[in-house]
Regions:
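His/Asp/Glu-rich metal-coordinating catalytic cores
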Residues: 9-185
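Conserved beta-strand positions
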Residues: 1, 110, 139, 235-237
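Amphipathic, alpha-helical segments enriched in basic
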Residues: 1, 8, 151-153, 187, ...
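A short alpha-helix capping/helix-coil boundary motif
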Residues: 1-3, 103-106, 274
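A short, flexible beta-alpha/helix-coil linker loop
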Residues: 4-8, 113-115, 240-242
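Accessory, non-catalytic peripheral segments of nucleic-acid enzymes
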Residues: 187, 191-306
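Detector for Asparagine
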Residues: 7, 39, 86, 92, ...
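Active-site beta-strand/loop signature of hydrolases that rely on acidic residues for catalysis
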Residues: 1-7, 38, 235
Length: 306
């Protein structure tokens, strides 16, 4: 886990218990866990009121440490890592890493804003990481999934659950398979329970609000089928035409929302703001209720839940 176990330096007891519970579940399955602190959960703010299982190793913020990854009681790889001491880390921590000659396979863990010079989040370059001779880099900090390098692999898996509408699309983690000769294969595993999505509709060809509503309902059904899970959707209306004026006024938006509500048996559209349509009835699922409650506390408009 390459930093930011928690999304802030406030680690509630409930969050700690939930995290520890999953770590114990992993331990029962024989899974080792390696953790470094990031900017949201730096070493100086880390709280561990709930004990973690012995199979969990949390890396120090004082120096780069190396810990064996055991498979069947034998060392399969060495894991290198260093934590953030405080929220801002302007040092290029990559320069502290160096693979040992005797390592069969080496994994580097770093919380970094790669390629952004002057960043307060351990800035470094691809060449800095490559020069360490590590065989794989497990990177944290960036919430989007991306792979800056494939030789060696430098991987940002992104986060496992989108937190707001800026984090749209599939979220999850990577299962990394290392072959007998050090070949690396990545498989993305989807883990998000709720997905943030954007839906764009061009209104140019519509002659009346009913045509717009039919198109939105059609696209919404397609999106449900595609993702197979609840979605929080930002509806973006683009283009010009007969409906442009109507959808730009509060009265017109209210009318469109009423038409959409009439088409939905289990969803209620709550409000509209400018070009954003918001869908707000809380479904029965506890996790969705919890998510919408959090969004409302922070006045984040939840758009369309489908």
């Amino acid at each position: 886990i390459s930093g930011d176990v928690y999304n802030s330096d406030h680690h509630s007891l409930a969050a700690q218990m939930a995290f520890a519970r999953e770590l114990y579940r992993a331990a029962q399955a024989g899974v080792q866990i390696f953790i470094i602190h990031g900017n949201h959960d730096p070493d100086e703010a880390w709280r561990a009121d709930v004990p973690l299982p012995p199979s969990v190793y949390v890396f120090s913020s004082d120096k780069v440490e190396s810990v064996p990854l055991l498979v069947g009681g034998e060392t399969a790889a060495m894991v290198y890592g260093i934590s953030y001491k405080n929220r801002h880390m302007r040092e290029n921590l990559a320069l502290r890493f160096r693979k040992k000659d005797e390592d069969t396979f080496s994994i580097g863990m770093l919380h970094t804003e790669l390629g952004v010079a002057g960043s307060p989040y351990a800035p470094c370059t691809v060449d800095d990481l490559r020069n360490t001779k590590m065989d794989y880099w497990a990177l944290g900090h960036v919430h989007a999934r991306k792979t800056p390098s494939m030789r060696p692999y430098m991987v940002y898996p992104g986060n496992t659950q989108g937190l707001d509408r800026s984090e749209s699309g599939e979220k999850g983690c990577y299962l990394v398979d290392v072959g007998a000769y050090g070949t690396v294969t990545l498989k993305f595993i989807v883990t998000d329970a709720i997905r943030w999505m954007d839906m764009e509709v061009d209104i140019s060809s519509f002659q009346n609000p009913e045509e717009l509503v039919r198109e939105v309902v059609k696209q919404r059904a397609t999106l449900r089928e595609k993702t197979g899970k609840p979605n929080i959707v930002r509806l973006i209306l683009r283009g010009q035409g007969v409906l442009q004026k109507a959808v730009s006024t509060p009265e017109g938006q209210t009318y469109i929302l009423q038409l959409l509500n009439d088409k939905e048996k289990f969803h209620h559209i709550r409000k509209a703001r400018n070009k954003w349509f918001h869908h707000g009835k809380k479904p029965d699922s506890n996790i969705i209720n919890d998510l919408l409650s959090v969004l409302e506390q922070f006045d984040i408009k939840a758009d369309i839940l489908i």
